Amino acid sequence: MMNTPVSGLVPFPAPQEAALHPQAVQVRADQPADPRAMLGAFEQLLGEFALDGYAAGAGVESAEVAEPIALVVGTSGSTGTPKRTALTARALAASAAATENFFDSNSNAASQWLLALPAHYIAGAQVLARSVLAGTAPVIARSVTEPVHFSPEVFLQAVERMSSARRFISLVPTQLHKLLESADANPSLGAEIHEALGSFTGILLG
């Protein structure tokens, strides 16, 4: 159980402290967060939505009353006034359900995610939340937890560690461009990259 924010309180005025769930995960863009610690917090926050039913959208309808905030992602404010994005556990579950339903297949395999984005970014945090909701352990690329850059080698190493046939990854355009550019420059490596990319049930890009 985690009773304190993962990366310290985001020093912005909103959302108000009273609206935060006791286990709320709070991160900001200029402070890297520990994805494993975040997983532990999400397990507490998302327990009622996990596993059975969430992929079909069960239990994630809009609530009529205000719910505690589960995730707060703050910007660094480098281009202006710092802002905060706040999501409830129900909102995280609804997002995960939408992804599952969009990539619906006949596979009985559980969904497994590869985390290739920083956990303190909203897309990275959502990968962790979706993993908890799916009841599977995400594979975390070395570039997320170690002082190495995302590269084709790091990507391929992470893909090799995946165990489910139903697999997902979230990337930003520059990451995908790097993979495809490397594939074009090195045919031997390119075959591995294309095979790895083709093994994913879904690739979220944004």
Region spans (language model):
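Conserved AMP-binding loop of ANL adenylate-forming enzymes
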Residues: 104-136
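Conserved AMP-binding A3 loop
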Residues: 68-97, 104
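A conserved hydrophobic position in a structured secondary element of the catalytic/binding core
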Residues: 87, 123, 171
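Conserved pre-ATP/AMP-binding loop-to-beta segment of ANL
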Residues: 54-73, 106-111
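Adenylate-forming
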Residues: 144-206
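Short beta->alpha connector loops at strand-helix junctions that form conserved
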Residues: 117, 142-143
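Conserved ATP-dependent adenylate/AMP-binding module captured primarily in the ANL superfamily
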Residues: 2-49, 93-114, 148-165
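Conserved S/T- and glycine-rich ATP-binding loop of Class I adenylate-forming
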Residues: 75-78, 113, 128, 169, ...
